[in-house]
Amino acid sequence: MLNNAMSVVILAAGKGTRMYSDLPKVLHTLAGKAMVQHVIDAANELGAAHVHLVYGHGGDLLKQALKDDNLNWVLQAEQLGTGHAMQQAAPFFADDEDILMLYGDVPLISVETLQRLRDAKPQGGIGLLTVKLDDPTGYGRITRENGKVTGIVEHKDATDEQRQIQEINTGILIANGADMKRWLAKLTNNNAQGEYYITDIIALAYQEGREIVAVHPQRLSEVEGVNNRLQLSRLERVYQFEQAEKLLLAGVMLRDPARFDLRGTLTHGRDVEIDTNVIIEGNVTLGHRVKIGTGCVIKNSVIGDDCEISPYTVVEDANLAAACTIGPFARLRPGAELLEGAHVGNFVEMKKARLGKGSKAGHLTYLGDAEVGDNVNIGAGTITCNYDGANKFKTIIGDDVFVGSDTQLVAPVTVGKGATIAAGTTVTRNVGENALAISRVPQSQKEGWRRPVKKK
C-alpha cells in the first residue's frame, strides 16, 4: 500500500515520579538502551520525515542523551494531558502528511505493528491501536456502535456499563495532519481530570462521519507502558526472552534462555553455544562453532570461527580470529586483537595489543600498547610497562620469542625474533634476534639463616 508522508510525535514530558529517580523516566534503559531511544529508532525505521519529541521534565538531560538524533524539540511547560501535549506540536504538522502519535515510555512497540496501523488508516479517518484485556481497570474504553468505533471513554469518566468493555485504548494513533490540527483545536478539559485528552478526537472524527479503524498489536508487550521500576524490570525480561526465543529458533544454543541478556545486535554463525548469565552488548559477531562460558560479557566485538571463551571473561571492542581460546577470568579491552589460534588465559588483560598466531599468554599478564608476533610464549606475571605517568609507549615482540615468568618490559622496547627473556628480567633496552636477555641480582646463600622471632 502506498502511504502518505508521515511525521511522528513522541510524548516524553512526564516526570516519572514513581521511578524515584533524578533521571527522566524515558531515559531509563531497557536492553541497554533508553526507552525513548527504542521509540525513536522505530520511528526512523518507519521512514518518518520528522520526529517531534514533546518534553518537559529533565529537558537538558534528554537533549544531552539524545543529541545525536535528528529531533524537533517541543516544550510542554505544563503537563495538562495528552491532547495538550499534541497541541504544542501541532504548529509543526504539514496538512498533507500523516501524524503518528507514540509514547516514550512504551518502548517495545514494533515497526511491523506500526506499519500495519499506518496501512489500515482510512482516508480522512483515524487508525487506532487497541487491545482487549481481561481486566481493563484504569484504561480508556473503546465504544462502538454496530461494530464501528465511536469514541474513547477514560476510566474515571466511564459509566458502570462502559467499564464492562474489555477493549481499551493504547494511546497510539495516526491521522492526517490537517485533520489532527482541526480536532486538537476543539479539545476541552471538561472531564474528571481537568485535562485535554487526545482520545476526544475519536468522537470528534466520528461526529464528522470519519471512519476509525482499530488495529491490534502482535503482542501485548508492545503496548505496555512503564511507570515504575518493577514494570520496567518485567518488560526487560519479556524483551529478553523474546530475543532468546529468536536466537534459539535461529540455531543458537542458549543453555537457559531466562539467563541471557542481549543489549544490542548479535550476528552469529552455525552451532554457537552460549552458557548461562552471558551478556551481549552493542554489535557482536560470533562465527561458526563459537562457545561462550557462563558469566561472560561480550561487547562490540568480532569472535571468529571455533573460538572458545571460558567463564567470567570480559571482551570489549576486540577482534578474535579463528580458533582462539580465552579465559577463564580474562579481560580483553578496546583494541585487543588475537590472530588465529592465539591463547589468553586466566587473569590476563590486554588493551591496544595484538597477539600473533599461535601465541600464548597463559596467566597473570598485562599486555598494553603491544605487538606480539607469532608462536610467542608470554610467561606468567609478565607486564608491558607502557605508561610513564604522562605518555603511553609501545612494546614490540617478534616471532618465536620466549618470555619468562615475572618479566617487565619497559616501553618503548623491541624484542627481536627468536629471543629469550629469562624469568625475573626487567627489559629496558632492545633485545636482538636469538639473544638471551637476563637482568638479575646474583643469587647469594647464607647458611644457617634464622628468621627473626616476634617479640612477645
Swiss-Prot record:
Pathway: Nucleotide-sugar biosynthesis; UDP-N-acetyl-alpha-D-glucosamine biosynthesis; N-acetyl-alpha-D-glucosamine 1-phosphate from alpha-D-glucosamine 6-phosphate (route II): step 2/2; Nucleotide-sugar biosynthesis; UDP-N-acetyl-alpha-D-glucosamine biosynthesis; UDP-N-acetyl-alpha-D-glucosamine from N-acetyl-alpha-D-glucosamine 1-phosphate: step 1/1; Bacterial outer membrane biogenesis; LPS lipid A biosynthesis
Gene designation: glmU
Family: In the N-terminal section; belongs to the N-acetylglucosamine-1-phosphate uridyltransferase family. In the C-terminal section; belongs to the transferase hexapeptide repeat family.
Taxonomic source organism: Escherichia coli O7:K1 (strain IAI39 / ExPEC)
Residues the record lists as binding UDP-N-acetyl-alpha-D-glucosamine: 11-14, 25, 76, 81-82, 103-105, 140, 154, 169, 227, 333, 351, 366, 377
Region (N-acetyltransferase): 251-456
EC code: 2.7.7.23, 2.3.1.157
Swiss-Prot/TrEMBL keywords: Acyltransferase, Cell shape, Cell wall biogenesis/degradation, Cytoplasm, Magnesium, Metal-binding, Multifunctional enzyme, Nucleotidyltransferase, Peptidoglycan synthesis, Repeat, Transferase
Residues annotated to bind acetyl-CoA: A380, N386, Y387, S405, A423, R440
Protein name per UniProt: Bifunctional protein GlmU
Listed GO biological process terms: cell morphogenesis; cell wall organization; lipid A biosynthetic process; peptidoglycan biosynthetic process; regulation of cell shape; UDP-N-acetylglucosamine biosynthetic process
Names of required cofactors: Mg(2+)
Record's subunit section: Homotrimer.
Binding site for Mg(2+): D105, N227
Family matches, as InterPro entries: Bifunctional_GlmU, GlmU-like, GlmU_C_LbH, Hexapep, Hexapep_transf_CS, MobA-like_NTP_Trfase, Nucleotide-diphossugar_trans, Trimer_LpxA-like_sf
Gene3D superfamilies hit by this protein: Hexapeptide repeat proteins, Spore Coat Polysaccharide Biosynthesis Protein SpsA, Chain A
GO molecular function ontology, one term from the record: magnesium ion binding
Note on cofactor: Binds 1 Mg(2+) ion per subunit.
UniProt-annotated location(s): Cytoplasm
Enzyme class, spelled out: transferase
Active site: H363 (proton acceptor)
Catalytic activity: alpha-D-glucosamine 1-phosphate + acetyl-CoA = N-acetyl-alpha-D-glucosamine 1-phosphate + CoA + H(+); N-acetyl-alpha-D-glucosamine 1-phosphate + UTP + H(+) = UDP-N-acetyl-alpha-D-glucosamine + diphosphate
Cellular component GO terms held in the UniProt record: cytoplasm; membrane
Name of a matching Pfam family: NTP_transf_3
Residue numbers spanned by region Pyrophosphorylase: 1-229
Sequence segments annotated as region (Linker): 230-250
Record function comment: Catalyzes the last two sequential reactions in the de novo biosynthetic pathway for UDP-N-acetylglucosamine (UDP-GlcNAc). The C-terminal domain catalyzes the transfer of acetyl group from acetyl coenzyme A to glucosamine-1-phosphate (GlcN-1-P) to produce N-acetylglucosamine-1-phosphate (GlcNAc-1-P), which is converted into UDP-GlcNAc by the transfer of uridine 5-monophosphate (from uridine 5-triphosphate), a reaction catalyzed by the N-terminal domain.
